[in-house]
């Protein structure tokens, strides 16, 4: 999914538009210039600069690209740049290396077999959060595939990879504290997610099983991915699911569920103190691996049914004066946020974290439409709008009979 972020109390969806300004070279032809995203200001001045791409994108002193980093330009806006292609050459100016990088991505998109169309561009990002969500639990992708995705994101100036590392389909990141998460819950018995889940197979196996599907990233591989992304000015935000979507965890550590059995529960037992020990130790490992300001903790689609009959959860509710299971979930989210804040990080959760009371500093990712995001913004919280109807990639794009397997499966 794509995701867009605005600051407190204001939510806006991207609308691309251009404004004409300064002329750069005399019109000879009328080139078609298609850029994604469209720059804030652009004038197509006509004609082409006849250069081979190698003359521009090489790092050699003979490169025809004149680039300048001026920290005072545009007030130091880190993402802004100015690009001019004229009959005499190409100039690129920015306040930071990040802005320079984005200008080069625009230049890459401009190149055609005829050369570079003559343009004058001034550009800066409208949205500070330009994200893509990758679910590697239901469908595992090795690090090389993640690298390819990061390259595509960089090409379109996207700056956040939302890395969905844990879910019922498998646990995908190495933990030194809880090694059974990857020995016992990273490989399932069917590569087809829908067959495995909807068909009630729902079993995990070990890596040496011939029918095993899955895998995980070692901590060193995570560091490689984070570094590769950083080189492209992309921040990787890990998502570790609490308190729901934890079906796989209980195949490794069943004592963290209300039933104490594998394959029964989907939610952590909030009344069990060991749950909070697990949470803090796992998040501490993620904080060491991911330097991102934000950590995504899920918070969506908790079944909550096991909490209603769990003696430990009911005892905690009585102790804390919680009226219902929605407030019990909110209690957990508040504790997660307090822990993250103590480590200098901030919490993002799906819009279900509104239920039972929103944690004070939480950022809400609104996926069940727009209303959760609007409500959160009115409460003074930052919001990332990700309404599934518009932004999920796994919907059918046409008649399902003509399309590949969609909505979670292949």
Describe the role of every protein-language-model region.
Residues 249-250, 254-362, 367-378:
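Active-site neighborhood of glycoside hydrolase catalytic domains
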Residues 2-13:
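Bacterial N-terminal signal peptides that target proteins for export
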Residues 137, 166-170, 241-245, 300-302, ...:
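Active-site beta-loop-alpha junctions enriched in small/polar residues
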Residues 11-21:
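Sec-dependent N-terminal signal peptides
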Residues 354-360, 367-410:
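Conserved alpha/beta catalytic core and glycan-binding cleft of carbohydrate-active enzymes
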Residues 76-277, 282-294, 310, 335, ...:
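Feature activates predominantly on carbohydrate-active enzymes
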Residues 18, 25-130, 341, 346-354, ...:
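Acidic, contiguous N-terminal accessory segments
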């Amino acid at each position: 999914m794509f995701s867009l972020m605005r600051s407190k109390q204001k939510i806006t969806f991207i609308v691309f538009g251009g404004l004409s300004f300064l002329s750069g070279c005399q019109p000879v032809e009328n080139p078609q210039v298609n850029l994604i995203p469209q720059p804030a200001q652009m004038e197509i001045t006509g004609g082409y600069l006849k250069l081979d791409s190698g003359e521009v994108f090489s790092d050699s002193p003979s490169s025809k690209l004149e680039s300048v980093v001026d920290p005072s330009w545009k007030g130091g806006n880190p993402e802004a740049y100015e690009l001019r292609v004229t009959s005499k050459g190409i100039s690129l100016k920015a306040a930071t290396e990040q802005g320079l990088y984005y200008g080069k991505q625009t230049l890459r998109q401009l190149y055609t077999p005829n050369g570079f169309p003559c343009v004058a561009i001034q550009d800066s990002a409208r949205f500070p959060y330009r994200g893509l969500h990758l679910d590697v639990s239901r469908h595992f992708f090795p690090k090389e595939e993640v690298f390819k995705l990061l390259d595509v994101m960089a090409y379109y100036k996207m700056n956040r990879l939302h890395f969905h590392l844990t879910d019922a389909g498998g646990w995908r990141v190495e933990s030194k504290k809880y090694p059974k998460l990857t020995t016992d819950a990273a490989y399932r018995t069917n590569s087809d997610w829908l067959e495995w889940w909807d068909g009630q197979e729902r079993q995990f196996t070990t890596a040496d099983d011939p029918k095993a599907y899955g895998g995980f990233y070692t901590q060193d591989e995570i560091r490689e991915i984070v570094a590769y992304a950083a080189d492209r000015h992309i921040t990787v935000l890990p998502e570790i699911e609490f308190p729901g979507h934890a079906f796989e965890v209980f195949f490794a550590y069943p004592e963290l569920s209300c039933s104490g059995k594998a394959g029964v529960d989907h939610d952590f037992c909030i009344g069990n103190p060991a749950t909070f020990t697990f949470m803090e130790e796992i998040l501490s490992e993620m904080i060491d691996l991911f330097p991102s300001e934000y950590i995504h903790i899920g918070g969506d689609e908790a079944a909550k049914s096991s909490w209603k009959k769990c003696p430990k959860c009911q005892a905690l509710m009585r102790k804390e004066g919680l009226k219902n299971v929605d407030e019990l979930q909110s209690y957990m989210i508040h504790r997660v946020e307090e822990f993250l804040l103590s480590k200098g990080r901030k919490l993002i959760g799906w819009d279900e974290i509104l239920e039972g009371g929103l944690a004070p500093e939480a950022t809400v990712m609104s996926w069940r439409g727009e209303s959760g995001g609007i409500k959160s913004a009115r409460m003074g919280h930052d919001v990332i709008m990700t309404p599934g109807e518009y932004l999920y990639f796994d919907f059918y794009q046409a008649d399902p009979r003509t399309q590949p397997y969609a909505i979670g499966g292949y």
